[in-house]
Amino acid sequence: MNTMALFGKVILLQFLIGVGFCMLMQDPKRNDTKSTYATCFRSQPQGNEPASPDCVKAFMAYAEDMKNIFHFTKEQINYLWSLERETQSLFHNHRRRKRQAVFLPVRKECRLLSEFERQNLFYTIRSLKMDTSNPNEYDTLANLHRGAVQPHAHDGSNFLGWHRVYLMYYERALRRIRGDVTLCFWDTTMDFNLGMDNWEYTAVFSSDFFGNRRGQVITGPFRDWPLPPGLTESDYLYRNMTRGRGMPFDSRAASSIFYNPNTIIHSTVTWEGFGFDTITNSQGQTRNITIEGEHNNVHNWVGGAMEFLDPAPQDPVFFFHHCYIDYVWERFREKMRRYFRDPTTDYPGHGNETLHDANYPMIGFEWFRNIDGYSDYFIQNVYRYESPTCQACYYSPYTVCGQGNQCIARMNYPGTEIEEGPQVPNSPVVAFSVAGGTMLMSAFNGRGFIATSNSE
């Protein structure tokens, strides 16, 4: 069988798997069970009081879902349940307290962390991954982002809330190792402002930060990072930063999201919404500004494992990137409040009409409803963000204060020796084609991320 025929069969099989999964997820009886599970988890009996038969049935159905959809073992399901119990206790305490927490962990830009803070965080992430206990906790959390979540947590309104909850679980897992760690965010507008010719020389892809930008990652805290068998063609974490393929988060898009008074409801910044602001690049190509679309560009820019849905969270850069996406969303929510809009109730419902419905239980976090991801609970009781300032950037060895009081990344200067790892073959499933400056999805399951524009 020739290569093209084989590829066609792979794409057809992936499409059929995706359709079958959607049919399973939208089964009315299953949805009733999921709703019961969410209700039961919110009102679990205290002490030795037995759960109701309906709740026992719902818990068993949830465990079966996690086994069938994510292929989790009993140990992995129990681990995730333990994280759910921790987050549930946080929510119960929040309801009793009903006051905003005074001292919250602060998520900062990664380059503005102190040396101690950065090394502490990176070491903790490595410890989570390299732990040899059963199950591997990092891999279990990464597997929550496998192909099954595609129609539920991407391409629609639930993208923002689902990933906010996902980050919270990841951060809770890290704090089990070191209670004083807090995630940082990677503000790629700082790298965008270097100019396209210099993007690949950003100093975050060095041994002090994320490691090398191309090939197998052999430098930095995430070097020699094993990938689960069969996930990619590589046994270890790899990247493939290539000019003209993806881009950092456009600082013009960020400015529009933060300040444009014409985009003050979620529909104007979410996938499949309306009323978008636009950007026109130097080739005259125009694209809509959405948070998810700009996010996709960064996945393509980093490349390698980050470029595909299933292995993306295996690169720790995934979580720093998504922490920035969450920061961008919170800045947008602040703008909404300035214009007397309530971000907790403004749920647009774009995307798959069932899976992105406001009251549909979140896949993987099924005691949350989708709209719960839009709650103010997180920013009031779990963490807060600290915006980069020129004063802080001035004192960091990794940033400078540029024109217009904008923080700009420092570079590994062109022409200097930048270590690169062994090259890794492309994934056997081709996920993109390029037409007119736009990357188009050509596979449903195991897909890559759509880039709204690959040229500037």
From Swiss-Prot:
List the InterPro entries hit by this protein, alphabetically. Answer: Di-copper_centre_dom_sf (IPR008922), Tyrosinase/Hemocyanin (IPR050316), Tyrosinase_Cu-bd (IPR002227)
Entry keywords, A to Z: Copper, Metal-binding, Oxidoreductase, Secreted, Signal
Q: Which residues bind Cu cation B?
A: 295, 299, 322
- Source domain of life: Eukaryota
Query: What does the cofactor field's note say?
Result: Binds 2 copper ions per subunit.
- What cofactors are annotated for this protein? Cu(2+)
**Compartments, record wording:** Secreted
**Record's signal peptide:** 1-22
A GO MF label:
metal ion binding
What does UniProt note about where in the body, tissue by tissue, this protein is expressed?
A: Prismatic layer of shell (at protein level).
Enzyme Commission designation:
1.14.18.-
Q: Which GO terms describe its cellular component?
A: extracellular region
Binding of Cu cation A occurs at 145, 154, 163
* Coiled coil (UniProt feature): none
Cross-referenced PANTHER family, in alphabetical order? Answer: TYROSINASE FAMILY MEMBER (PTHR11474), TYROSINASE-LIKE PROTEIN TYR-1-RELATED (PTHR11474:SF126)
Task: Kindly provide the name given to this protein in its UniProt entry.
Answer: Tyrosinase-like protein 2
